[in-house]
Amino acid sequence: MSKEIKFSSDARTAMMRGIDILADTVKTTLGPKGRNVVLEKSYGSPLITNDGVTIAKEIELEDHFENMGAKLVSEVASKTNDIAGDGTTTATVLTQAIVREGLKNVTAGANPVGIRRGIELAAETAVASIKEMAIPVHDKSAIAQVATVSSRSEKVGEYISDAMERVGSDGVITIEESKGMQTELDVVEGMQFDRGYLSQYMVSNTEKMVAELDNPYILITDKKISNIQEILPLLEQILKTNRPLLIVADDVDGEALPTLVLNKIKGVFNVVAVKAPGFGDRRKAQLEDLAILTGGTVITEELGLDLKDATLEALGQAAKATVDKDHTTIVEGAGSVDAISDRVAIIKAQIEKTTSDFDREKLQERLAKLAGGVAVVKVGAATETELKAMKLLIEDALNATRAAVEEGIVSGGGTALVNAIAALDKLSEEGDIQTGINIVRRALEEPVRQIAANAGYEGSVIIDKLRSEKVGTGFNAATGQWVNMIEEGIVDPAKVTRSALQNAASVAGLILTTEAVVANKPEPAAPAMPPMDPSMGMGGMM
């Protein structure tokens, strides 16, 4: 396929047109009075959203050069979303502002390499200032404030803060679609895995069809139990303690299962058998997690252990185990705190190293089951369109909250970015490097200008007043009042704010130093078929 090439200002100007189209679409959603954007989908109802990265990903432009500019800004939004989970619209606004001011100077004869160095230096300094401003987040009310600002909903703020309070910062919070119209929070404490009892005759509560074991021993093995003789010595030891037994094994079949069921029905002892969770290496890891949580040992040939030789010391213990037809939940395992902490540290290290999103998700689930719990926010709405929009809002709020817990919070509404300008006053460079610093200085005001504009105010007037206000005071676009942003609960996660600036500066610098753009030439349209002569092709018909 032949290529089309543009150079110098022609290339940068073409990309800038694409950047403007995407950014102008996305930035209308910024702030408490931001508007929605309607996205046409290939099937189903349109999606109504104010999520920056979702909008950016949908935009495809006909002109290849413009489309490349748009895609570079979309990449900024995606990168910010991957790192911080929110702040995608802010990142888009910052990128547009830096590139726009940078192109003016490059067109006027400035050296783009010098400007890029100035942009990078200014961004690095502003990021350090944002980190210094950050206030640690620990209490539930601060978490609720972050979630409320991100989602523009106090109700969502309550759900997220309740979930984080109950499962902890290491817990997993998932978002699902509810079957009803109400949004609900469901929390599972302890370790739960998706395996149920192997026989319904093992239930102790026939009304709920649930097997409940109080203070049980837990046999954990990767072996298949087919012969009751394999575990008979162990069963005799457990019988003397008069405590129930939960068996977690690769499978229980053959004569072993009916023998266990018969003894359960006769009341000889209380036993429930379930299959081990997961498959392959993940099964092995989950069984080890379960053993550490309950203070037991995985009975496996890899360690030279045999079921016939197992003693009570090899069994795990817990305060309670509940088993239904699909799930097993173990609460208050008897494992040592130190062993669990060591295991948590290992899993966290694996999360840091992995490059697979799927592996990361599974590792986080394991971490939650050991260190916290699992909370499920079930989103309900009157229509499918509203449900999709609500789900995106809650996902953003959840990501913002996690980022806040990780690196703290700063004044919201773009105020922290304007406050960071003071740190740039300490930088004194020459020539084009100083020009790059001044470009970032101007760009840091842009989110506040846009938030004000979306709320119907003149951005320049708001910025002029904000410059004279003390640090931390900002403009509440929702009410039109000047307030202490932190005290008012208008806050942003520091991680979101600094990620937006870092990613915007990085891509803007690359665009400004671009000297040539190579795009595929549009394919010429295929010639239309000539109309058919009526006298041809039908001659055989009378």
From Swiss-Prot:
- Please tell me where ATP binds in this chain: T29, L30, G31, P32, D86, G87, T88, T89, T90, G413, N476, A477, A478, D492
Positions of disulphide bridges? none
Upper taxonomic lineage: Bacteria, Bacillati, Bacillota, Bacilli, Lactobacillales
Briefly, what is this protein's role? Together with its co-chaperonin GroES, plays an essential role in assisting protein folding. The GroEL-GroES system forms a nano-cage that allows encapsulation of the non-native substrate proteins and provides a physical environment optimized to promote and accelerate protein folding.
- Can you supply one Gene Ontology CC term for this chain's record? cytoplasm
The main location is cytoplasm
CDD domains for this protein: GroEL
Q: Which reaction does it catalyse?
A: ATP + H2O + a folded polypeptide = ADP + phosphate + an unfolded polypeptide
Q: Name one GO molecular function term.
A: isomerase activity
Q: Does the keyword Disulfide bond apply?
A: no
Q: Name one GO biological process term.
A: protein refolding
Biological source species? Lactococcus lactis subsp. cremoris (strain SK11)
Subcellular localization: Cytoplasm
Concerning its family, UniProt says: Belongs to the chaperonin (HSP60) family.
Keywords, comma-separated and alphabetical: ATP-binding, Chaperone, Cytoplasm, Isomerase, Nucleotide-binding
Q: What EC number(s) does this enzyme carry?
A: 5.6.1.7
Protein name, per record? Chaperonin GroEL
* Domain of life the protein comes from: Bacteria
* Subunit composition and interactions: Forms a cylinder of 14 subunits composed of two heptameric rings stacked back-to-back. Interacts with the co-chaperonin GroES.
